[in-house]
Amino acid sequence: PYEYQKEGIAYALEKKRCIMGDEMGLGKTAQAIGTMTASGAFPALVICPASLKLNWQREFRKFGGINAIILDDSNRNVWQNILRMKRADGKPFAQVVITNYESLKKFFVRRLNRQERFTLKSIEFDERVHLFRSVIIDESHKCKSNKTQQSKFVQGIAQGKEYVLELTGTPVVNNNMDLLQQLNIMG
């Protein structure tokens, strides 16, 4: 890693919750993987746009030598068992689960309780969200509104995690309020 990436990793290791807001192409993914590898805060969940899931899987293998599984319908009910599996050398078979924003409800929300106002308390999460020690949220500016279900799902999943890393090249899209929900997600 470059010197500025080493500084980013050191900062994330110290703070445990941060927004990596570098411009595109400066290695936010490598910094996040470096932070997870150095901290050992596995299992980790990566939440990213659907088009980036394969990239995250490749990058974890390339930069960290870590197997990552992409959550889909075929492993929907068994992924937690895959995290417990060991290879012949005794190391975990996989330490990272990757999913996209649009699948959070399908995989991690048990029920939405009807209330007059939709809040974080309206969501009943699947207990498997507690298996993760850390969460990486790629393109975190997608969570700029505190009113959307997607932002609330991310916030609820991130609660209580040892590490919460938010990656975005544009932390503020329209106005400074865009940053507020991203900060709420960090806790």
Regions picked out by a protein language model, each given a short descriptive name:
Residues 33, 59, 175-186:
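PAPS/PAP-binding and catalytic site of the sulfotransferase fold
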